[in-house]
Amino acid sequence: MIKDVYELLLSRKNEIEKQISLLDETSNNLLKEKIKEKWKEYCQTQGKLSTVLAIDGGMWIKELRSGIVYIVNAEIVKAEGFNVTPIDSKALIGVLRPGNMAKERVSLLMQLLELKLGLKHGDKAEYILFDGSIVKKIGKHKFSTKISLLDDIDVMDDKIYSLEENDEELMHKYLVAENQLVMSALISKYKGKLVWISKNSKSTELFQENISDVSLLELFTKNCGYTIGIEKKISSENIISPKASTILSNASFYSFYTRLKEGEKILKIEMFNNEIENIISILSPISIKGYPYPLLKVHTDVKVSRQDRERIKQLLNIKKKDIEWWPSQLF
């Protein structure tokens, strides 16, 4: 019962508070030196006015006794300064039965729509901004055997071939493969334009501490600047498509952290080149509170709000729970 939780919390209050406080004085001094070695203060006051594309997606799933209802959508916008214009969008709605790995598959569907929009319209601007990370787009699954069944698909086609598979486990693998095929085509065509931006990275790869790199940088730095770029490689173990493997396996990319505006949040950026100050000069002039406005705008457009969810349920005649505390799985 929740009463037991409160009793446990009171008995361990001091211990938990110490862990929340993060660091002692000795650790503070050591980390300050560590960060000083890797953080370069750099404020871009002028910057370059370039055209950029920003892409993001939204998703919603509803678990029912009959299966999983899902909705995904994605949008691409073009920005010149703070003038943002929608270019194209895609949406899907369907039911997964019985619904195993539903969240993972719906997330892959959303991601696939994003990548397809980038591939279709990548020639319309100098840079293409995605929310998230390269590794997340590739997937962290490890596959002992490759799947070549989808290697001959037309990646420019609007069709999602994986949805034709009824077996849920196979569909999941096909979705990973289809994402990787579109991703490899995107890299082949627009490698130098691609930029991934993450605002919630939990990575510890730079400082190798048990606290995230972002948390440490936000704790010990306030000015705008960036960290040294780290070269990374896409692991061949994570590539399930033989055709995609020719482009993606062991491909190098660079990651670094930056703060675009003084006192604002730290962002993690990944690209296929190490031109850090150049991309900062592109992003700084179009940022609000330290985050690129085009990505903020497209995120707002695709987000499935609470009001949207209620309206969708009404349109689909999904009845509302009579008892609010009743578990959704039994509804």
From Swiss-Prot:
Regulation: The 5'-3' ssDNA and dsDNA exonuclease and ssDNA endonuclease activities are inhibited by SSB (single-stranded DNA-binding protein).
EC code(s) of this entry: 3.1.-.-
Pfam families: NurA
Cofactor(s) annotated in UniProt: Mn(2+)
Keyword terms of this UniProt record: DNA damage, DNA repair, DNA-binding, Endonuclease, Exonuclease, Hydrolase, Manganese, Metal-binding, Nuclease
InterPro entries: DSB_repair_nuclease_NurA, NurA_domain
GO biological process, one term: DNA repair
Induction: Part of the nurA-rad50-mre11-herA operon, these genes are cotranscribed.
Molecular-function GO terms, alphabetical: endonuclease activity; exonuclease activity; metal ion binding
Binding site for Mn(2+): 56, 131
Result after altering residue 291 to A: Strong decrease in nuclease activity. Does not form a stable dimer
Domain of life (superkingdom): Archaea
Regions crossing the membrane: none
Assembly mode: Homodimer. Interacts with SSB.
Entry similarity comment: Belongs to the NurA family.
Function: Involved in DNA double-strand break (DSB) repair. Probably acts with HerA to stimulate resection of the 5' strand and produce the long 3' single-strand that is required for RadA loading. Exhibits both single-stranded endonuclease activity and 5'-3' exonuclease activity on single-stranded and double-stranded DNA.
Domain note: The C-terminus is required for interaction with SSB.
Protein name: DNA double-strand break repair nuclease NurA
Lineage: Archaea, Thermoproteota, Thermoprotei, Sulfolobales, Sulfolobaceae
